[in-house]
Structures are given as structure tokens and as C-alpha cells.
Design a protein with these regions (language model features):
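Short, flexible loop/turn elements at secondary-structure junctions
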Residues: 50-58, 71-73, 80-82, 136
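Secondary-structure boundary elements
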Residues: 37-42, 71-77, 114-126
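Short, contiguous, pocket-lining structural segments
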Residues: 61, 70, 101
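Short regulatory "switch" loops immediately downstream of catalytic or recognition motifs
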Residues: 33, 55, 81-85, 111-119
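Short histidine-centered catalytic/ligand-binding loop motif
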Residues: 13-17, 88-101
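Metal-dependent nuclease catalytic cores that hydrolyze phosphodiester bonds in DNA/RNA
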Residues: 1-66
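Conserved catalytic cores of phosphodiester-cleaving nucleases, focusing on short active-site segments
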Residues: 65-92
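Metal-dependent nuclease catalytic regions and adjoining charged, substrate-binding loops involved
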Residues: 96-103, 108-166
């Protein structure tokens, strides 16, 4: 029965989850929601998994992104981080952010939100922020929120230049 059910689900383009995976995700979400600042970001959001489409002004390239959280022009990005090696601790997260170029992602997403809001004639907040909501992947699922303000556009252009070289 189970194999047939899994095959049926997969044929429909769905992915079955194990109960252990569901429990794991719920435990991480519960720890994140316990942060008072996270509650403000998550509960007051305008949307989750919001898709944005725009054309980059400088290069004329069509762009898209999918925001985890959009809250009155503010962006929230969920990050699951490995607990070993420092996990959600500030210095460890900074190292991970640098190595994985999270700053470029943040700048790219900010450009997208700014372009979409401008197109829709929606005013942006005066102080624009990008927040990473970080949760470790092992119990006790330590959490943190890190914020950058007014992401420099130059980081987006660095991404485009690097992409053009490929």
C-alpha cells in the first residue's frame, strides 16, 4: 500500500514527507517563533514566498526572485544553518554569509522589491531593511535574527558582472 501511495503522489508532482521530517520542521519553526522579533516579522507579513519579476535597469536583464517574507517593503529571508562550527552565532553566520554571498542575494532581492514597488506606485519605507531569520539544524535549534539596512546596489552589480563572465 505505501509504495503504491508514494508512486501515486509522485505521479501527481507532489513530494511525500516522512513524519520525522515534519517533526523536524515543526521543531525548528517553533523555536524561531519563540523569538519576539521573529513574531513581529512573521505575523505582520504582507506575504510569504512572494514572487517578484522585474527588468534590471542597468543591464536590461529580466530578473525574478522568491521572497520568503515580505512585510511592508521589508524583506525577511529564512536560513537553516548547520549547528556544528558555530551555527547561528554572529561570527559563524558572518563567515557563512560571506562565503555564500548572502549580501549579493540581499541586494538583488532589494532591487527587485524596489522595482516592483516603483512599478505599482507603492511607497517604500524610509528605512529599508533585510533580515535573515536564522535557525540551526540540530536541537536545541538555536535561532537569531540579523539585519542589514539599505543594501548597497553595488553588490547586485557584482553579481551581474560575475554572471556575465560565466
Amino acid at each position: 500500500f505505501c509504495k503504491e501511495w508514494v508512486e501515486d503522489i509522485q505521479e501527481k508532482g507532489l513530494e511525500p514527507f516522512k513524519q520525522s521530517d515534519i517533526n523536524y520542521a515543526k521543531a525548528m519553526a517553533r523555536e524561531l517563533r519563540d523569538l519576539e522579533d521573529a513574531q513581529e516579522i512573521l505575523e505582520g507579513a504582507d506575504g510569504y514566498e512572494v514572487s517578484c519579476f522585474w527588468v534590471n535597469e542597468k543591464y536590461g536583464l529580466p530578473c525574478k526572485c522568491k521572497l520568503d517574507i515580505l512585510n511592508t517593503g521589508q524583506i525577511g529571508d529564512l536560513k537553516k544553518i548547520t549547528a556544528s562550527g558555530g551555527g547561528a552565532e554572529w561570527q559563524s553566520f558572518c563567515r557563512t554569509a560571506r562565503n555564500l554571498e548572502y549580501y549579493g542575494q540581499a541586494a538583488f532581492y532589494r532591487d527587485g522589491v524596489n522595482a516592483v514597488y516603483a512599478h505599482l506606485k507603492i511607497p517604500l519605507p524610509e528605512l529599508q531593511s533585510f533580515r535573515w531569520l536564522v535557525v540551526e539544524d540540530e536541537p536545541p535549534y538555536d535561532t537569531a535574527i540579523y539585519e542589514i539596512l539599505d543594501t548597497p546596489r553595488s553588490a547586485t552589480y557584482q553579481w551581474f558582472e560575475a554572471g556575465r563572465e560565466l
